[in-house]
Swiss-Prot record:
GO terms for molecular function: ATP binding; proton-transporting ATP synthase activity, rotational mechanism. It is a peripheral membrane protein. Pfam families: ATP-synt_ab, ATP-synt_ab_C, ATP-synt_ab_N. It comes from the Eukaryota. F-type ATPases have 2 components, CF(1) - the catalytic core - and CF(0) - the membrane proton channel. CF(1) has five subunits: alpha(3), beta(3), gamma(1), delta(1), epsilon(1). CF(0) has four main subunits: a, b, b' and c. ATP binds at G170, D171, R172, Q173, T174, G175, K176, T177. Produces ATP from ADP in the presence of a proton gradient across the membrane. The alpha chain is a regulatory subunit. It catalyses: ATP + H2O + 4 H(+)(in) = ADP + phosphate + 5 H(+)(out). Its EC number is 7.1.2.2. This is ATP synthase subunit alpha, chloroplastic. One of its GO terms (cellular component) is proton-transporting ATP synthase complex.
């Protein structure tokens, strides 16, 4: 048996006393009073911040949203089925933040920036607050570079600039998401990072969008943030802010980004659900009083940064669904007033076979031609006016039986112009192809063709120019101007192609 000397014991005790570190650890805790419907009421948590993350005993994380005199209202970021009355909660001292890095490109994540595509963890060393203040006036500069969507109707008449916020609005099943996804597909090779945020969508439609991106190589420069319809309201509410934080990370690193919110009205519904359960007073359409602020603080984060900050940009394209064309509902009017213009998609046009179903008459871009290259300004000037006059004449022509020759010609031209605006889904056009298409239509080169032949002729003309006269594309892309030389090349190509086309049609 080992005998321990008394002085050894005293040495050990002395050593331990010397090593003892008096560390006071203060933990801000509380107790669950009530839990259910994704909301927990907590007693305690005296020094909790608004929006602070709190952690429940069994691991669920929540956000403290309501700070009342007797309790704290917390929204849960999970189902919270294991939380019991009386269990303890501790404040983390952190506001909601997510990891950010280049490694997120090509991935599908949830509102907490956790991967949901089954391809393993995402490495990152930096963190960014989910909610951060928008750039101030001095930090911005006016929008001057175009963000090409690849859709003729938008790029020619409702141009979108880098750093702009343009609303895409229309009834369900009018092709809103298709316009947004085509815009992402068109950014290939243009050094633009895209973020697609799906809020409250069907999982099948999100999967379809992701597959479309993968097949066309767009996932290389795209991040998809998805919270589907079965996600807790808290996560649907957070998803757009997560997407904005990721886009901001790239924007402040002198990159151009584009973010699509599909759609903020679902976020507003999730926020309404949370607010009503937290017993906040309801306002118009039962939405809480700060639902405007919900969207304004999100969309104001889109900006074109000043040269001091590196001239990065974040272009926001929110998508809002209307009920039977009612643009005057609460959420649509809110978002219209926040954004710099809107693209209105009409169910009537969609059903009439005009796709993309953009109603050019009531769609606007408040940035306007500042976001167009010179070549596009040169050819697109007449297009909107001619289409507006055509729409007016068409309505008038329904009542008039005999029309003079000039009116008949104007109607024929208008029908062909409307035809050239039609495009297939996932087939965006480059700006050079758009310029030649619009020039061909507005200068009457399509007037002699049947309406059914217009699209076929234009497809063949674009192919003919690309293979036989590549210098046209070089002039437009290098000078960004529709020069006399480019016009001469184009006129010659149209003449040659028309002769070939007429011979083909006669042979058929």
């Amino acid at each position: 048996m080992v005998t321990i000397q008394a002085d050894e014991i005293s040495n050990i005790i002395r050593e331990r006393i010397e090593q003892y570190n008096r560390e006071v650890k203060i933990v801000n805790t509380g107790t669950v009073l009530q839990v259910g419907d994704g909301i927990a009421r907590i007693h305690g948590l005296d020094e909790v911040m608004a929006g602070e993350l709190v952690e429940f005993e069994e691991g669920t994380i929540g956000i403290a949203l309501n700070l009342e005199s007797t309790n704290v209202g917390v929204v849960l970021m999970g189902d919270g089925l294991l939380i019991q009355e009386g269990s303890s909660v501790k404040a983390t001292g952190r506001i909601a933040q997510i990891p950010v890095s280049e490694a997120y490109l090509g991935r599908v994540i949830n509102a907490l920036a956790k991967p949901i595509d089954g391809r393993g963890e995402i490495s990152s060393s930096e963190y960014r607050l989910i909610e951060s203040p928008a750039p101030g006036i001095i930090s911005r500069r006016s929008v001057y570079e175009p963000l090409q969507t690849g859709l003729i109707a938008i790029d020619s008449m409702i141009p979108i600039g880098r750093g702009q916020r343009e609303l895409i609005i229309g009834d369900r099943q009018t092709g809103k998401t298709a316009v947004a996804t085509d815009t992402i597909l068109n950014q290939q090779g243009k050094n633009v990072i895209c973020v697609y945020v799906a809020i409250g969508q069907k999982a099948s439609s999100v999967a379809q969008v992701v597959t479309n991106f993968q097949e066309r190589g767009a996932m290389e420069y795209t991040i998809v943030v998805a919270e589907t319809a079965d996600s807790p309201a808290t996560l649907q509410y957070l998803a757009p802010y997560t997407g904005a934080a990721l886009a901001e990370y790239f924007m402040y690193r002198e990159r151009h980004t584009s973010i699509i919110y599909d759609d903020p009205s679902k976020q507003a519904q999730a926020y309404r659900q949370m607010s009503l359960l937290l017993r906040r007073p309801p306002g118009r359409e039962a939405y809480p009083g700060d639902v405007f602020y919900l969207h304004s603080r999100l969309l104001e984060r889109a900006a074109k940064l000043s040269s001091l900050l590196g001239e990065g940009s974040m272009t926001a394209l929110p998508i809002v669904e209307t009920q039977s064309g009612d643009v005057s509902a609460y959420i649509p009017t809110n978002v219209i007033s926040i954004t710099d213009g809107q693209i209105f998609l009409s169910a009537d046009l969609f059903n009439a076979g005009i796709r993309p179903a953009i109603n050019v008459g009531i769609s606007v871009s408040r940035v306007g031609s500042a976001a167009q290259i010179k070549a596009m300004k040169q050819v697109a000037g007449k297009l909107k006016l001619e289409l507006a006059q055509f729409a007016e004449l068409e309505a008038f022509a329904q009542f008039a039986s005999d029309l003079d020759k000039a009116t008949q010609n104007q109607l024929a031209r208008g029908q062909r112009l409307r035809e050239l605006l039609k495009q297939s889904q996932s087939a965006p056009l480059g700006v050079e192809e758009q310029v030649l298409t619009i020039y061909t239509g507005t200068n009457g080169y399509l007037d002699s063709l049947e309406i059914g032949q217009v699209r076929k002729f234009l497809v063949e003309l674009r192919t003919y120019l690309k293979t036989n006269k590549p210098q046209f594309q070089e002039i437009i892309s290098s000078t960004k101007t529709f020069t006399e030389e480019a016009e001469a090349i184009l006129k010659e190509a149209i003449k040659e192609q028309r002769e070939r086309f007429i011979l083909q049609e006669q042979a058929a």
